[in-house]
Regions:
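Acidic/glycine-rich phosphate/pyrophosphate-binding loops and surrounding catalytic core
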Residues: 2-173
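Single conserved hydrophobic/aromatic residue that forms the stacking wall/gate
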Residues: 174-180
């Protein structure tokens, strides 16, 4: 498994955008109705087997909401998990846990889902074949999606148009004759 690291700055800025998307303009109006804000402990438990990914995004999501939240990772990024595996334990004020839980779970689900699916293809293809991803990613999620492919054992192709030349059918068709 290749060692992949995303910068802390990238993870932080991505989590800030995600939280802003969820909380703008008025915050979590439902959680704000709760009177209780006691310290609580929550376990993140896998609901199926697969490859876990996105732990640093989940951790940073809670850290941005409350620096006092403890996020204890129980499984390594890129490791196999089974249904019922404890992935992480979160301890902190319940309101902040509730505010961040959906954003954190979305990162975990998306990255783990891609890594798990990629891993299935990699196993099926065998050692002599590389499973590569393309640039056909959701805008602004390319780095995360390609990261997930690597976690699953896949290979990244081009990240952008300047990485290498790629001549596809469009360039060899009549449409290309119109371009100087």
């Amino acid at each position: 498994m290749p060692k992949i690291q995303l910068s802390k700055n990238f993870i932080r800025s991505t989590c800030k955008l995600a939280l802003n998307e969820d909380l703008y303009p008025l915050g979590d109006i439902t959680t704000n109705l709760l009177k209780n804000n006691s310290i609580s402990k929550v376990k993140l438990i896998s609901n199926q087997k697969g490859i876990i990914g996105g732990l640093e995004f989940a951790k940073e999501t809670f850290n941005l909401l409350d620096k006092n939240i403890k996020f204890q990772i129980k499984k390594n990024e890129g490791s196999k998990v089974t249904r019922g595996s404890v992935i992480a334990v979160i301890e902190g004020k319940i309101k902040n846990i509730l505010i961040g839980e959906r954003v954190a779970l979305n990162f975990l689900s998306h990255i783990s889902g891609i890594a798990t699916k990629t891993n299935k293809f990699v196993k099926k293809a065998g050692k002599k074949t590389k499973i590569c991803c393309t640039r056909k990613t959701i805008p602004n999620l390319r780095v995360i999606q390609k990261y997930a492919v690597k976690l699953g054992g896949g290979t990244n192709h081009r990240f952008n148009l300047s990485d290498e030349y790629l001549i596809c059918l469009l360039y060899t068709s009549d449409a290309a004759d119109e371009v100087d």
